[in-house]
Amino acid sequence: MAVRFSFYYAAIFLAVGIHLPFWPAWLKYRGLDAAEISLILSVSVWIRAFANPLIAHFADRSGAHKKVIMISAGGGVITYALFGIADGFWALFVVNLLASAMFMALIPLGENLASRASVEHKFDYGRVRLWGSITFILAAYIGGWVVERSGDEAILWMIIAAMVAAFVAGFSLPRRPARDRPSVRFPAFVLLRQKSFLVFIAAVSLLQSSHAVLYVFGTIHWREAGLPDD
């Protein structure tokens, strides 16, 4: 079981390791300016904030975590493939909304399955999760090497290949039974009434916002400073 989740984490963070540093560069390659790139990537975060809880709520109620992961990964392959034919800001904007909702749901859904499975099957969650971090580092390095030699066009194809790997890895994940129905219809709303949770959300928001400029313009800035992708 630990090997299955290690493979899943490796596949997911293969995609993240390419997407995080190089996706803004691909959008610039497609002719978008700094304001358009910022808008597309910032709206992606808001989409995740609303889509992920809804997707997770459905998975918990139905017990279809694996099925939802497979649909999200398959949807990720399709939506990222659509980037290849999308032309212009608004087409890229709409496709990016769909891709963000699909792609980023894979991480919390996988975390949920892995944390529960680590207790039931008695494996070390940290060692399993480690493979995601290792793959992220390797993906960023190897991705830079490929982009330096093949150009920005290769970025999209590497992400699509990584999403295919995530789809394949999803087949090996265990199925989970549906949870008992809670006493309230949307348990997440209960958290929003807790002061400590709101403070936590505020702290995480500030942490994420401090990374935003680096995530969006880091690679572009380093290129303009004369640093190679590899």
Annotate each predicted stretch with a short phrase.
Residues 1-45, 49, 197-230:
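Helix-loop boundary and gating motifs at the non-cytosolic
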Residues 67-81, 160:
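Structural signature of the two symmetry-related core transmembrane helices
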Residues 170-208:
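Juxtamembrane intracellular "pre-TM" segments in multi-pass secondary transporters
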Residues 95-131:
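Cytoplasmic helix-loop-helix junction between adjacent transmembrane helices
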Residues 50-64, 147-148:
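Helix-to-loop junctions at the C-terminal end of transmembrane segments
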Residues 45-53, 136-137, 141:
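Residue-level signature of mid-helix packing/kink "hotspots" within the transmembrane helices
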Residues 106, 143-148, 155-179:
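C-terminal membrane-cytosol helix-exit motif in multi-pass small-molecule transporters
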Residues 2, 83-96:
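Helix-loop junctions at membrane interfaces in 12-TM secondary transporters
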